[in-house]
Amino acid sequence: LDWKTSLTVKAHGLGKEEPVYHMEVSGPEYAQIFTARVSLGENGDIIGIGTGSSKRKAQLAAAEAGWKSLDSLKTRTK
């Protein structure tokens, strides 16, 4: 599984909303940097941020950060 799928599975397992990715692009057109922020639900708190040279890389990095955030939350609430 990739990080995006893993995050969706973990969110559903915890009874949370579907992950939503918000994208920003910066830098010149020949060297763009993509930044993804992931939240649970359209208006949820940001649980992960990632950057990359493509939209997919940024989303995967954000999903990994979000997965780790949810995992630490789950561990703290046990």
What is each model feature region?
Residues 1-78:
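Double-stranded RNA-binding/processing signature
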